[in-house]
Amino acid sequence: MKPAVVLLSGGLDSATTLAIARREGFACHAMSFDYGQRHGAELKAARRLAQSLGAIEHKTVHIGLDAIGGSALTDLRIAVPDHPQNGIPVTYVPARNTVFLSFALGWAEVLGALDIFIGVNAVDYSGYPDCRPEFIRAFEQLANLATKVGVEGGRFRIHTPLIDLSKADIIRTGTALGIDYAMTVSCYAADAEGLACGVCDSCRLRRQGFEQAGIADPTRYRS
């Protein structure tokens, strides 16, 4: 099996991405990040999911994006909104996917892997600029210009299997692949036990996705 690095947050989208990469026959090395986010529940979920979904290795990288703040997810002084916002919301973490993909790229070089999977989505999403197809294309170009592998003739590919799927379609896909979505944590403001707030944008999209998919939502909500 070809090796691949799969970014795994512990949420619904990244779990589905890992399951898809496994279905496609990749030997998956899962990578998660403790980046100073509000809660650690998603990292606990990521560890469980990596094992459940058959990753051959799971690495958690510690980076301090809370040192620069600028996001409701890394700065406790900024409240997580309980309603949709116009424009790019305060839950956007500056340069997060650029940083995450850079670490994934470095690990891929070490592993001899040319494939990186990330669960970004540009349909039912919060409007983050680093989830758009044009960002992924630009990063893939960077990856092939800025690495020893690229200079020596190899070619990295950034896989985004969810990019054009609705949340409902993502849930249907993952359910067909046997994912237990009760194990995932998507909420921006989950508590230590992984209970979801039920009102943030991520909870709203998740609830809407299960409803539109016609599948019972296993999420434990506080409200």
Swiss-Prot record:
Specify whether Lipid metabolism is a keyword of the entry. Answer: no
Against SUPFAM superfamilies, the record matches this protein to:
Adenine nucleotide alpha hydrolases-like (SSF52402)
Query: Which residues are listed for Zn(2+) binding in this entry?
Result: C187, C197, C200, C203
Which Gene3D superfamilies does this one have? HUPs
As its record notes, the protein acts as a catalyst of: 7-carboxy-7-deazaguanine + NH4(+) + ATP = 7-cyano-7-deazaguanine + ADP + phosphate + H2O + H(+)
EC number(s) per UniProt?
6.3.4.20
Say yes or no: keyword Hydrolase present: no
GO molecular function, a single term: ATP binding
PANTHER family from the entry? 7-CYANO-7-DEAZAGUANINE SYNTHASE
What exactly does this protein do? Catalyzes the ATP-dependent conversion of 7-carboxy-7-deazaguanine (CDG) to 7-cyano-7-deazaguanine (preQ(0)).
Tell me the protein family, please: Belongs to the QueC family.
Q: Which HAMAP family match?
A: QueC
Protein name (database record): 7-cyano-7-deazaguanine synthase
